[in-house]
Each structure stands twice: as structure tokens, then as C-alpha cells.
Curated annotation (Swiss-Prot):
Species the sequence originates in: Psychromonas ingrahamii (strain DSM 17664 / CCUG 51855 / 37)
Keyword match Cell division: no
Domain of life per record: Bacteria
SUPFAM superfamilies according to UniProt: S15/NS1 RNA-binding domain
NCBIfam families, per database record: S15_bact
Protein name, as recorded: Small ribosomal subunit protein uS15
GO CC terms, sorted: cytosolic small ribosomal subunit
Family: Belongs to the universal ribosomal protein uS15 family.
Length: 89
């Protein structure tokens, strides 16, 4: 199950540069982080759900690519985002 529209709107409002900013790297990485956190709870109950685990690994990889891009372009925004999301990078 994915995030609800309200949850996505909260993330966009918190990390976006404007109200309708859904394309910036910060917003996309935050959305991926929320989806990954949701799926980790799913896997605690459904250990053998390998099909969804593949989707999780794809999301983790895509988030890593976005964060690497952000680190190259704006180191200050990268470090602030990592601290706010609570990621170990």
C-alpha cells in the first residue's frame, strides 16, 4: 500500500520549495523514505513477501541515486535533508 494523498501533501509542504514542488530531489527522497519506512513495517509481518521486497530494493536504490545527485549539486541541502530524515550516510 502506498502513501495517502494527505501524507504526500504533508511531505511536499515540509520539504518542497513551494506548495506544488513535487519534483525537487529533496521531496522525492523524502517520499521514497516514507514509502520505505512503510514497507519495512509490512515486512515484519510478511517475511516471505519477496515480490514486494524487490520493489523495496528498487526504491532504496532510486533514493540513493537522488541523494547522490543532491550531494553533488548542493552539499548543504544534502546534509540538512539527511539529518532531518534520520538517514545514515
Amino acid at each position: 500500500m502506498s502513501l495517502s494523498a494527505e501524507q504526500k501533501a504533508e511531505i511536499v509542504a515540509k520539504y518542497g520549495r513551494s506548495e506544488n514542488d513535487t519534483g525537487s530531489s529533496e521531496v522525492q527522497a523524502a517520499l521514497y523514505t516514507a514509502q520505505i519506512d512503510h514497507l519495512q513495517g509490512h515486512f515484519k509481518e510478511h517475511i516471505h513477501d519477496h515480490h514486494s521486497r524487490r520493489g523495496l530494493l528498487r526504491m532504496v536504490s532510486q533514493r540513493r541515486k537522488l541523494l547522490d545527485y543532491l550531494k553533488r549539486k548542493d552539499v548543504a541541502a544534502y546534509t540538512a535533508l539527511i539529518a532531518e530524515l534520520g538517514l545514515r550516510r
